[in-house]
Structures are given as C-alpha cells and as structure tokens.
A protein has these predicted regions:
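ABC ATPase nucleotide-binding domains
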Residues: 1-88
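Generic detector of ordered secondary-structure context
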Residues: 12, 81, 95, 149-151
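ABC transporter nucleotide-binding domain
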Residues: 77-108
C-alpha cells in the first residue's frame, strides 16, 4: 500500500495495520526509522495501527489511544505520558505502566491508607466540579524518588519491592 500511495497523486493518507508485528527487533528499528524518513520526505498523512506503545510513541506525531472501541485520548506522545485523561492511557503509555491508587475526597485534596495528599487549587476545583467518587491518583514509577530523611514535601512510605532495570 505504501508503494501505491507514494506514486499516485490522488492519495492523501496511507494506512499501516500492524506492519512491523512479525519482524525481528533490529530490522524493526531500521524499518521504523525508514518509515519516519519517508513520512517527512513526502509529507503524507500516515495512520499507523499498532498495539506496541513504544512503536507508537517513537513513530507518531499524534497518537489516538482506543479502549473498548472508542478513542479515549488523542495527543502527542508526551501529552499522553504526562497527562493521561483515562486510566487505560496511564496503563498503556509508559513502561513500567502508571501505578493507579484509589483515593477518597478530603479537605483540600485526597486521602488513601490514612495519608492526606494535598492538591493544587486547579485540581481541587476540578474535583468539586465532578461529583464522582471514582477517583484515582496516577504515579509514574520513574518520578518517584527515595530520600534518606523525612520532608514535608514528600510522602512517607515503606518500600516493599525494587526492580533492578540495569541503569
């Protein structure tokens, strides 16, 4: 389909449906880079369907994340990573996935397991405008820091597991 799309004048978009699924990792990396070069050279819209979030994040200018047959968020890879607006997006984008903690409303914030987590004025207003009791806080593991001493700006907790990622 890509060849026909490149030689015809009446094509404005090319659809790729899992094009790199059964290709070995090294060749996949080379082909992904080549597709990106072709995209930039010909300035065609490419719709790239994949279940591989790394592939989507490195290839795409914008990503549409689907869940249950519906698009639940559309944005840049950075927007999806930093500000997921659906729990599936938080789970799907990033590795390891986002930790989701069910919380309860509390004055000026939320609470869980006896811990009060203050929220910004913007988030507090957002919660007051949305009466749902289904509230979750998402924490990306790479943004967690371990400190030797207690701090008012940190949450005290017990580390129960640590995964060595080799870095």
């Amino acid at each position: 389909s890509m060849g026909r799309g490149l030689v015809r004048d009446d094509v404005s978009a090319i659809l790729f449906d899992e094009p790199l699924t059964v290709i070995d990792p090294h060749l996949k990396w080379k082909l992904r880079r080549k597709l990106k070069q072709i995209h930039e050279q010909f300035n065609l819209t490419m719709v790239y369907v994949t279940h591989d979030q790394l592939e989507a994040s490195t290839f795409a200018d914008k990503i549409a994340v689907m869940y249950g047959g519906q698009i639940v968020q559309f944005g840049t890879p950075r927007e999806l990573f930093e500000s997921p607006n659906h729990t599936f997006v938080g789970f799907f984008i990033g590795s390891p996935d986002m930790n989701l903690i069910e919380v309860d409303r509390a004055d000026g914030g939320v609470s869980f397991d006896g811990i009060h987590l203050p929220l910004s004025d913007t988030l507090t207003r957002f919660l007051s405008d949305h009466p749902s009791d289904n509230i979750k806080v998402g924490i990306r593991p790479e943004f967690v820091h371990v400190w030797d001493e207690a701090s008012e700006e940190a949450l005290q907790c017990d580390v129960t597991a640590c995964e060595d990622l080799g870095t």
